[in-house]
Amino acid sequence: MQKALILCKAGFDGKNVEGAGVYTAAALARFGVSTAAAAKIDGDFSDIIREFFRKNGVDDSLIAEENDDNFNVSPDDFDAVFITGEFVLDNENSYYFAKKICEECRKLEIPVVFDPGNFGEKENVEIIRDFALKAEVFVPAIEDAKQLCGLTEPEKIADYFISLGVNKIVITLGKQGAFFKSRVESGEAPTFRADKVVDVTGAGDAFAAGLISGVIEKIPLSEAVVRANACGCCAIQSEGFSFPSIQELREYMLTHRFVVDGCKDY
């Protein structure tokens, strides 16, 4: 069975479990990928957060409580690792743990997918760039990518990061889909037409899950991005965080066409 490790930080806002990567883990598990979360969690809501992961088929045995920075995990049992900027920037121990995981993954030739998220302060830019170089696939949103390099056009941004040594980059463009580039292929992948737009909350998490599953399967980057776009479009058609199974996703991709101008109002 395919296995993925998610490094994320999880909290609870009084209504929902939250945190970058949390719902990506749930979406991957929905695809049938054996998914484990090495998460930092708010100790006050530990039971709620753990129950969320278990309910969604995510292994919670690697979770560390808020004041516990000791993660006992090795990536050698996994086919891919997903790291969020929120986890990396949480504290010094999280940073060094994520760095160690990246180094081990490189030795073991296990792909790392890194999503910087909204990394905030300018002093974090160098840290984010460093992890972009450590990852197999760097996945910034367009606005975050602009902040990282000062450029505005997706193709020029991608060229910039590839010139620095980034292996593969996928720049998410919202309703316009995504721009991708590696050393062997590049292009813009449009999104799919949505039958309806109900809630865009989980679109980014679904996109990441689709991309990671493609990386695990070792399909071309262009195909992985198309799958990721389809996942995002599926997710916005239901209330809350609703993710397709891999069978539902494949059916959706067969029955829906690309659109250049995005998923209607998405």
Where is each model-derived feature located?
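N-terminal Rossmann-fold NAD(P) dinucleotide-binding loop
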Residues: 21, 46, 208
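Conserved post-catalytic alpha-helical subdomain immediately downstream of the catalytic base
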Residues: 30, 164, 192-261, 265-266
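Short active-site segment of divalent metal-dependent hydrolases/proteases
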Residues: 12, 145, 207-208
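Histidine-anchored nucleotide/phosphate-binding helix
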Residues: 21-30, 97-103
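Alpha-helix C-terminal capping segments
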Residues: 16, 23-36, 214-217
